[in-house]
Amino acid sequence: MKKSALLLVVLAVATSTLVSCGNASTAGSKPPSNLTERVLASQSVSSATASGGLVIIDGQYDTLGRGEVSAGTSPGLMAISADRATLLAFDSATDKVEVVNTTKETLTGGIQLPGSTMSMVVPQPDAGYAAVPSAPLTGTSPGAVVAMNLTSGGITATIGVPNAQTVVSNPSGTQLLVFSNDSDAVTVVSPALLNTASPVTLTVPLCTGCRPVNAVFSSDGSTAYVLNCGAECGGTQASVQILDMTTTPPTPGASVNVDGATIAFLSGSTLYVAGNSPTNSACTGETTAATVCGRLDLVNLNSMTVTGSAVITDGYHDRIDMGNGGQLFIGSMNCTNIGNVNNVAGEVRGCLSIYNTTNASVVIPPDNGDVTGFQSFNSRYVEYVAEGGNLRVYDLFTDALLPPNQYIETGTIIIPGYITDVKAIDFF
């Protein structure tokens, strides 16, 4: 595949119409559900006993709220603005992005994408972006980042980036990093340059065989820490590489080799990096029937050195979140599943790992299936985890399912259908 992207900007206007989005609920004005600590879970299966939509959950008691928000027939992946006023849900049945006003708990409209997406960002309440690898473009290879106007509705621009898989925004939404499969370069998109004579995109080559797939920005947006997938993605050595975002074009800097790098979480000067290594994949220290395991590496960004490593589940790691209390939740898809959580006889294992950042211990909970969503809370010591289509509630004091109480009996919020993603739409 080409290592540099042939870039094309195609301006377009979609036919969908939206109304302006409101703010997340506050103590002074309750939403229709009458809840002030709300969580939305995307339920993506429609059947005789369940209908696709966004289920409203009382995040204080882990109970179902009244009704749900309509968002197509198969909503899955969700993205939310920093102020939690606007939520996007991708309907895989129609390739449409459904836009939700979280204050009114209503669908305000939908934007038709030119294909499927697995990556969306909402850096500003009125602007969203989706990576669409199959987006058809005249005269160039398929693939684009679709810029969406979330206030007036429609597609603002289709920005050509061949095979665009993942889009990451800086904190202010002024720069986007776009990653394409089998590429050793990253594409930088500057949305403010749309409709100007200046190029909207820049291609920044990295090292041969790097295969960059993702990035984490510093809090001020001046630095991006690029995750080079390396051998796991058909390249050579996995690494974390600094990208100086204050220069034009951005300047690649120092790098540090890691076992694998597909997802990461930044905490202070430590970057927690998860992935798989083709040469360091033994499940050392674990009692398990699994023959292959992944790795979590701890990178000190001040010295650009690896200061620790832990054995975690295998699979493609694409979900990560820090719980309230220092537990790092790492999720993957297509991992080694062992046993049956619904008929326990011996070891049960799935795609979830919990790393304790205080004592460096790892817990592999007895569950099955892909991990597709996380949600932590500032006011509670629990973590919501969407795994295998179920919405689990983990107790952060025990790293196990929440014990029975008057609101929840099984550590699972029972919702008919298949739960794909989960997002808090209030601050709590």
Predicted regions and their residues:
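Predominantly soluble domains enriched in secretory-pathway, periplasmic, or organellar proteins
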Residues: C21-F428
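Sec-dependent bacterial lipoprotein signal peptides
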Residues: M1-S20
